[in-house]
């Protein structure tokens, strides 16, 4: 039984279509109402701005669902951009694609996208990408563990490659001897940040999130040795982030530019990244006073 009717969805789609100059067409404006009607949860609330934003995000999201010879992918930009990978994909925003797209009723779109990243020419390490965490949190909505379990070896391989690391324009991205992960801000989706290159709260939070996700996927697969191994990895990262990246004076997570150095003297929004993965213990919440 439907609780909400589709009249609001139709009204919003018609408004958005009128205001749009349609230059790129994967799922056309003409097809959008039928597509969203079949694929998204309907939503209604007293705040019209919030409601309009909800439907606008879905109206926009479908523009980026792209059919390719490797199945469906989700793009960040509609026009091709030179810093993208195969099929104009970019790993930097990909986890957000899963967190939003997990509510799509047709699982084919993100199933294809998952296999693309790990087996069909995607470049999941071109930018920071909490891929295992994104896959697992999608599973919590779909409850279909088949692609998750099938891709577990690939997720482990991806994590191992982050640990080994690689050289990028004179820098070594990956895990260092101190146990933390190093990256440059551009590869972390934070180019021109004040904190700059180093052991950043972002990437280290992402690796914590991925380690926890792999542990949970291994639990579904009944592979206790892998479950324990990755839970231990997550615990070590958590302790290091709290010990090395927390500024006890300004009460904030910051960038550590180099091993043995001092933390950067800047509070940036990415200092809240650890809470995205529910990582910090109690006692660190004073950082949130900056937003109160």
Across the structure, where does each feature detected by a protein language model lie?
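Substrate-binding groove/exosite segments of carbohydrate-active enzymes
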Residues: 15-152, 156, 254, 259, ...
